[in-house]
Amino acid sequence: MIRASKVHGQYHWKEPAADTVVLDFDDRHRRRMAMTGTRGLSFLLDLEHATALRGGDALVLDDGRLIEVVAAPEPLLEIRGRDPQHLVRLAWHLGNRHLPTQIMAKALRIRRDHVIADMVRGLGGKAVEIEAPFDPEGGAYAPAHEGAAHHDHGGHEHRHHDHGHHDHADHEHDHKHDHGKHDHAGHDHAHDHHVHDEHCGHDHGHGHSHKHDHK
């Protein structure tokens, strides 16, 4: 089977594509995977490291032909605030839960999650269910690949994470903050941690409860 072992960055290519692959967020985070294009061309994605592909990238086959990557629509939540300051506050809460987030001009997009939707609405924001391609921000320290702001994951493979479901059983993080006269008793800082499935390339074992007593 012919291989695709290189990636041309987002729209940094001019040649016509021999075929197209339509991939969701999970399948755009692969190192090695057999694929078939929409026109029937089968090939093996065989990259040196797991790479975050984006819509508009091109996979380079061994014979020089290109396969265009198209981001598939998937179930998302579009989050809006009352004003820019409120939207930034909502973004902080999403970041506190380590959720992949796509930043729009006046909105945020995350993978659909009913727990997070309820949280956003409880904070006064809007959370609307949509179907759209998902192109979240990459890591702040991620190197680029060939003209685009893509990252690879060094010597270890980060497969996709399922952020659609949150397991509240095994990840009990009871963060109790005692800051002098500041009483945080009414605030439950529960972190909705994502489930790491079989595609995660590293062990995230959290078998203990984290309690932080800041005096």
Curated annotation (Swiss-Prot):
GO terms for biological process: protein folding; protein-containing complex assembly; urea metabolic process. It holds the Pfam family UreE_N. InterPro entries: UreE, UreE_C_dom, UreE_N, UreE_N_sf. It is found in: Cytoplasm. CDD domains: UreE. Residues 164-206 have a biased composition (Basic and acidic residues). GO terms for molecular function: nickel cation binding; unfolded protein binding. Coiled coil: none annotated. It comes from the Bacteria. GO terms for cellular component: cytoplasm. Residues 134-215 are annotated as: Disordered. Keywords: Chaperone, Cytoplasm, Nickel, Nickel insertion. Belongs to the UreE family. Involved in urease metallocenter assembly. Binds nickel. Probably functions as a nickel donor during metallocenter assembly. This is Urease accessory protein UreE. It comes from Rhodopseudomonas palustris (strain HaA2).
